[in-house]
């Protein structure tokens, strides 16, 4: 063990049994409760997500190794570390700065920069801004259980990682936000290594687009691209098509006991963004007339299917209605042009859960085809390997597909009788470059100065094992189209 770090000054609250009231505290003051004899695991420590970003020069020499983490339900704030200093004789240099609720990181009296954070549930991001600075991006989180409470502030905070002061670069407030801002996703839309856009939703059901393309942070702005009524508590995913991006997210929450027991209908959305301000989607009164194509989800035993509807009604995107009690609380994973969405449904009064993993065609929200990245779901009727199954006419069925109603169809997903989370692993990925072919640019990885991300998101570069690994070490393998040895055209590769 080289380092043990506790952000002990982080503000939080505890329930005082003597007065039946919430009282202010810090993580350091609460640490003693974790060691008490009767402790039963009912307190939060540092349970938020974190992002790791290693920065190297064009010779692969390490320049920085940043870690930016959120407190989650353990406190109202975030912390930044520089792990490149972990081998130094003075470990105090590892700690860069903390971001705390109701504090002003630049130590002046300008209240416009004052931080108003709730519990920072989710995962922050790190990205390179247009000015050339590396920055940490933090959502305001949730201050109050009641979504309509004025204590919930909806804002995106951006901090300079070039120094140890935590100097604020920007505070972008959403004036009509509701319920607090959820985790953001950073996007490099032109794949040049710098962040242009951030997307994030709020618990009121809205999705926002933060424009970060100007080199002057004072000119950064935010607008609504989707208006709804269902809580958005996880970061969206992004899929890059020929002439637009698809912002993919689900609705639902499991933050509180009431949320876990809630069985209201929730949805998965794919909202088209072609950089035009007129493309706002309003689904607050339902799908009809919203410009969204509604695709229908069906389940046969444990296997999931989406229909292949395309009637021209989806000019602004698509939507999938989930079954009663299902919800989405984690960021989808995009593989080629398929979004794999983890869907949770609680049962047994919240003590148990089932998990559905659903692959969705990002272009229309519907069925998968042999030209899609697709799951190889369990089942006697599904081709598990090449030559495993044939049609009634003797034709070989592609891996991951099956014959159904005289046609070859590819199942969209599968339902597991257990609560699991998944992580995508690709045997052929030889580095951890954090910018994807779709432009998702804020996650963990090594950013090599001067390197450009791959642009192909239509086919796999070669044969290899690709899987969604579950946290219980089970897995759901993925297959899809292979790129040809000879390129026919740039259009085939990129679009």
Q: What does each model-identified segment do?
A:
Residues 1-495:
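A fold-level detector for beta-propeller and closely related beta-sheet-rich head/sensor domains
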């Amino acid at each position: 063990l080289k380092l043990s770090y506790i952000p002990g000054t982080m503000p939080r609250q505890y329930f005082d049994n003597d007065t039946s009231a919430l009282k202010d505290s810090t993580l350091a003051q609460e640490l003693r409760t974790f060691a008490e004899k009767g402790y039963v695991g009912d307190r939060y420590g540092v349970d938020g997500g974190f992002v790791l970003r290693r920065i190297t020069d064009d010779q692969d020499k390490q320049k920085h190794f940043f870690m930016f983490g959120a407190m989650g339900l353990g406190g109202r704030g975030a912390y930044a570390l520089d792990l490149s200093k972990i081998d130094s004789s003075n470990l105090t240099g590892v700690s860069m700065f903390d971001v705390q609720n109701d504090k002003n990181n630049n130590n002046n009296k300008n209240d416009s920069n004052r931080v108003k954070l709730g519990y920072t549930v989710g995962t922050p991001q790190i990205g390179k801004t247009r000015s050339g600075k590396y920055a940490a991006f933090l959502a305001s989180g949730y201050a109050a259980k009641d979504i309509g409470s004025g204590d919930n502030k909806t804002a995106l905070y951006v901090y300079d990682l070039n120094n140890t002061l935590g100097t604020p670069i920007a505070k972008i407030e959403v004036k009509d936000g509701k319920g607090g801002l959820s985790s953001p996703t950073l996007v490099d839309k032109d794949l040049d290594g710098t962040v242009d856009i951030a997307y994030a939703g709020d618990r009121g059901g809205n999705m926002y687009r933060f424009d970060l393309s100007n080199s002057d942070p004072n000119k950064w702005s935010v607008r609504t691209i989707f208006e709804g009524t269902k809580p958005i508590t996880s970061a969206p995913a992004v899929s890059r098509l020929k002439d637009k991006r698809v912002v993919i997210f689900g609705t639902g929450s499991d933050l509180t006991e009431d949320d876990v027991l809630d069985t209201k209908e929730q949805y998965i959305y794919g909202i088209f963004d072609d950089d035009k301000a007129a493309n706002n989607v309003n689904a607050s009164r339902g799908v009809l007339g919203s410009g969204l194509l509604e695709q229908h989800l069906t389940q046969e035993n444990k296997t999931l299917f989406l229909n292949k509807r395309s009637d021209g009604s989806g000019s602004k995107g698509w939507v999938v209605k989930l079954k009663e009690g299902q919800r989405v609380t984690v960021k989808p994973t995009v593989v080629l042009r398929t979004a794999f969405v983890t869907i949770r449904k609680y049962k047994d009064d919240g003590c148990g859960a089932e998990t559905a993993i659903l692959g969705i065609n990002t272009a229309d929200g519907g069925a998968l085809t042999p030209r899609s990245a697709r799951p190889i779901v369990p089942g006697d009727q599904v081709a598990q390997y090449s030559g495993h199954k044939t049609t009634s006419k003797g034709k070989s069925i592609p891996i991951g597909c099956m014959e159904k109603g005289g046609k070859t169809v590819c199942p969209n997903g599968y339902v597991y009788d257990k609560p699991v989370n998944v992580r995508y692993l690709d045997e052929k990925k030889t580095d951890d470059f954090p910018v994807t072919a779709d432009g998702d640019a804020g996650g963990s990885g090594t950013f090599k100065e001067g390197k450009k991300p791959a642009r192909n998101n239509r086919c796999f570069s070669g044969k290899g094992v690709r899987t969604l690994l579950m946290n219980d070490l089970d897995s759901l393998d993925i297959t899809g189209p292979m790129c040809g040895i000879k390129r026919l055209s740039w259009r085939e590769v990129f679009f």
